[in-house]
């Protein structure tokens, strides 16, 4: 069974990975920014600052690649030491994960590997049964919350 590191937002993910008690060497990270309105910024931050400074390879799985090249996407994920799902619009994130078939892949990775699954905010919600999300604010409904169905790998409501 795998390891999940779910962050509410902020913090240094590498510190959490090292302190998880399940730490092993991380050489390859896959960044998933499906929820973000600016995934290139998040990817570059992970690549250049958070992990790149330690010589860790960071690869970017885009929504286009996930939706159009499932076999390539699966290979990329299975070859990772850590998968990081960034925050943003949780509804958009879950829609893309399900449409691309990655929901099944993530569940299998969790059950059959020691790959660390991680995420912040929307990226943390995705691993849980449900999440309390502000995704409606992306459509002009400021302050409104929505209960979003995650992958259910962890049977909790993430707020």
Language-model features: where?
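Conserved PLP-enzyme active-site core in the AAT-like
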Residues: 84-85, 89-97, 126
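N-terminal beta1-alpha1 cap of cysteine-dependent amidohydrolase-like domains
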Residues: 1-82, 86
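Short, surface-exposed, polar/charged, turn-prone segments marking secondary-structure boundaries
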Residues: 32-35, 56-60, 88-89, 111-114, ...
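Gly/Ser/Thr-rich beta-alpha loop segments that engage phosphate groups in nucleotides
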Residues: 10, 35, 89-90, 121-125
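Class I SAM-dependent methyltransferase SAM-binding "motif I" and its flanking Rossmann-like core
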Residues: 95-96, 102-159
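Broad hydrophobic/π-residue packing in well-ordered secondary structure
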Residues: 46-51, 84, 91, 109-110, ...
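Glycine/Thr-rich phosphate-binding loops of Rossmann-like dinucleotide-binding domains
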Residues: 14, 39, 93-94, 128
């Amino acid at each position: 069974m795998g390891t999940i590191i779910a962050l509410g937002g902020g913090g240094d993910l590498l510190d959490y990975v090292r302190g998880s008690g399940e730490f092993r060497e991380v050489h390859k990270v896959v960044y998933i920014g499906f929820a973000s309105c600016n995934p290139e910024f998040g990817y570059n931050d992970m690549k250049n600052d958070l992990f790149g400074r330690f010589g860790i390879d960071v690869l970017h799985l885009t929504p286009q690649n996930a939706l159009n090249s499932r076999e390539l996407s699966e290979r990329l994920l299975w070859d990772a030491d850590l998968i990081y799902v960034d925050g943003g619009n949780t509804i958009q994130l879950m829609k893309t994960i399900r449409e691309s078939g990655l929901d099944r892949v993530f569940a299998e990775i969790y059950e059959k590997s020691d790959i660390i699954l991680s995420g912040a905010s929307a990226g943390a919600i995705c691993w849980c049964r449900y999440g309390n999300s502000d995704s409606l604010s992306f459509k002009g409904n400021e302050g409104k919350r929505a209960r979003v169905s995650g992958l259910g790998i962890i049977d909790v409501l993430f707020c």
